[in-house]
């Protein structure tokens, strides 16, 4: 089984998250996607809304038989993605995991704790985001792992590829972001 992992604050979850999840299922040869709604993001200056609220809203929004919305990081007590991946790989030895991220995250991936360990442990599926394509494609992580890049036409192989492997896919984009939703006051933490 191949499971895509979409981690994030989901503060708030929105239709853009649903869109990239559905696209990831189609493009990367995934059997399932697990949303990992994180307790917090070490790279963000302010804490998110309460986890229970974000989980409830994510579950209300993401209704798909092949997608599970989870609070796994809070349950297992991990703070960083590399730690979470190590625990999941030990806990589910028969599952092949693919880390999913928007292009905006690839652009600053080199700031993540143990980002190279992430690239070396699981394939990574990168989904285009408005305004982030060039920054992502020229980022330190993209340059460092340029030889591991799969062509977009071979994206369906990603889930069966050995790490390091990554693929950038273009897709119809939705110009939504949690940051912008919070700024409008439509979501209160």
Swiss-Prot record:
Gene3D superfamilies with a match to the protein in the record: HUPs
Keywords: ATP-binding, NAD, Nucleotide-binding, Nucleotidyltransferase, Pyridine nucleotide biosynthesis, Transferase
Pathway(s) per entry: Cofactor biosynthesis; NAD(+) biosynthesis; deamido-NAD(+) from nicotinate D-ribonucleotide: step 1/1
UniProt keyword Phosphoprotein, yes or no: no
Catalytic activity reported: nicotinate beta-D-ribonucleotide + ATP + H(+) = deamido-NAD(+) + diphosphate
Ranges in a coiled coil: none
Top-level enzyme category: transferase
Domain of life per record: Bacteria
One Pfam assignment: CTP_transf_like
Enzyme Commission code: 2.7.7.18
Stored SUPFAM superfamilies: Nucleotidylyl transferase
Keyword Flavoprotein: no
Record-level Gene Ontology MF annotations: ATP binding; nicotinate-nucleotide adenylyltransferase activity
A GO biological-process term: NAD biosynthetic process
Family statement: Belongs to the NadD family.
Main function: Catalyzes the reversible adenylation of nicotinate mononucleotide (NaMN) to nicotinic acid adenine dinucleotide (NaAD).
NCBIfam families: cyt_tran_rel (TIGR00125), nicotinate (nicotinamide) nucleotide adenylyltransferase (TIGR00482), PRK00071.2-2 (NF000843), PRK00071.2-4 (NF000845)
Protein name according to UniProt: Probable nicotinate-nucleotide adenylyltransferase
Organism annotation: Cereibacter sphaeroides (strain ATCC 17023 / DSM 158 / JCM 6121 / CCUG 31486 / LMG 2827 / NBRC 12203 / NCIMB 8253 / ATH 2.4.1.) (Rhodobacter sphaeroides)
Designated gene of the protein: nadD
């Amino acid at each position: 089984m191949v499971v895509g992992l979409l981690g994030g604050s989901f503060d708030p979850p929105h239709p853009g998250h649903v869109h990239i999840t559905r696209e990831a299922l189609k493009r990367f040869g995934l059997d399932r996607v697990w949303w990992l709604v994180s307790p917090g993001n070490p790279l963000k200056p302010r804490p998110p809304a309460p986890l229970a609220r974000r989980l409830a809203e994510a579950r209300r929004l993401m209704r798909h038989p092949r997608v599970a919305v989870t609070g796994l990081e809070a349950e297992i007590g991990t703070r960083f993605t590399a730690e979470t991946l190590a625990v999941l790989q030990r806990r589910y030895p028969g599952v092949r995991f693919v880390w999913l991220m928007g292009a905006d995250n690839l652009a600053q991936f080199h700031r993540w704790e143990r980002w190279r360990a992430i690239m070396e442990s699981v394939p990574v599926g990168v989904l285009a985001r408005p305004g982030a394509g060039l920054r992502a494609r020229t980022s330190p992580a993209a340059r460092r792992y340029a030889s591991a890049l799969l062509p977009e036409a071979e994206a369906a192989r990603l889930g069966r590829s050995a790490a390091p492997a990554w693929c950038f896919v273009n897709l119809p984009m939705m110009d939504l972001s949690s940051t912008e939703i919070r700024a409008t006051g439509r979501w209160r933490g």
